[in-house]
C-alpha cells in the first residue's frame, strides 16, 4: 500500500510538472493524444519508439523532457531547414537550443560548441552525418547527454522509403552514452521498419522499452462524392459571371 501511494504521488507530480511546463512555454493547457504518455515514458528512463502522424506534436515529446533533464538532449534531424525552424521556435519561447550543421560559418560553429560546453544549452540539433564525426563525439564527451532523440527514425531502416546509411551509425553514438535515454520518432513505419529501428538502436537492451502507435485517423479529413446537378454549360456560365463580378 505504501509503495502504491508513493508511486501515485510521483506519477501525479510528474503530470503536474509537465502541464506546468506546457502552459509556461507553449501556452497550452493540455496535451494532444499520446504526448503525455510518451513524455512520461521518456522521463521514467524508458527507451521509447513513438509512431505519430504528421502534426501530432512529436517535438513536444522530447522538448518537454529536455527541460527536466540535467544534461543536454541531442536531436538527430535529417534536414537543415527543420533544425532551423525548431531552434527559432524554441528561442522564441525562451528554451536555449542551437544546431550544428554545414550552414554555419566557422566562427558561429565554434561559438555554438563553446555554448554547449558551458552547459547553457538544453537541446542540440544536428544531422546524422554531423553526429558521427570525431569532432562532435569529442564535444559531447565533455558534457552530460541525458537524451538522444532520433527524428524521422524510419530513415534508419533499410526497409524504409527514406533510408539513409548515416542513420544506422547512430547506434555507435548510443554506445558512447549508455546512460542516455533514447527516443525514436516517426510518422511512418510498418511493423518491419519498427522492428528494424528497435534492433538497430538497441532499444530496450539496457533500459525498459515502450512503444506507442497513435491513430492516424483524421476526422477533419475525408473524401466525399457530390452528384452534380444541372448542365455543365450552366455551371460554367455561373463561374464566368462570378469571376466577372
Question: In which residue ranges do the predicted regions lie?
Answer:
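Conserved helix/coil segment N-terminal to the catalytic DExD/H
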Residues: 105-147, 157-161
Amino acid at each position: 500500500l505504501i509503495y502504491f501511494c508513493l508511486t501515485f504521488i510521483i506519477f501525479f507530480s510528474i503530470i503536474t510538472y509537465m502541464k506546468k511546463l506546457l502552459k509556461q512555454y507553449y501556452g497550452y493547457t493540455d496535451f494532444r493524444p499520446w504526448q503525455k504518455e510518451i513524455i512520461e515514458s521518456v522521463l521514467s528512463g524508458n527507451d521509447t519508439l513513438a509512431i505519430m502522424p504528421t502534426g501530432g506534436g512529436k517535438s513536444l515529446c522530447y522538448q518537454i523532457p529536455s527541460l527536466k533533464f540535467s544534461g543536454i538532449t541531442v536531436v538527430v534531424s535529417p534536414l537543415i531547414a527543420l533544425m532551423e525552424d525548431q531552434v527559432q521556435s524554441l528561442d522564441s519561447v525562451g528554451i536555449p537550443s542551437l544546431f550544428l550543421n554545414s550552414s554555419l560559418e566557422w566562427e558561429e560553429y565554434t561559438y555554438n560548441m563553446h555554448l554547449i560546453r558551458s552547459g547553457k544549452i538544453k537541446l542540440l540539433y544536428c544531422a546524422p552525418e554531423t553526429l558521427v564525426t570525431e569532432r562532435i563525439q569529442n564535444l559531447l564527451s565533455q558534457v552530460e547527454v541525458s537524451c538522444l532523440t532520433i527524428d524521422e527514425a524510419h530513415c534508419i531502416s533499410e526497409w524504409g522509403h527514406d533510408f539513409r546509411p548515416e542513420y544506422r551509425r547512430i547506434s555507435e553514438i548510443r554506445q558512447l552514452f549508455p546512460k542516455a535515454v533514447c527516443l525514436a520518432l516517426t510518422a511512418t513505419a510498418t511493423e518491419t521498419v519498427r522492428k528494424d529501428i528497435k534492433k538497430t538502436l538497441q532499444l530496450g537492451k539496457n533500459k525498459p522499452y515502450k512503444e506507442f502507435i497513435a491513430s492516424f485517423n483524421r476526422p477533419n479529413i475525408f473524401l466525399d462524392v457530390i452528384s452534380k446537378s444541372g448542365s455543365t454549360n450552366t455551371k460554367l456560365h455561373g463561374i464566368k459571371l462570378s469571376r466577372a463580378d
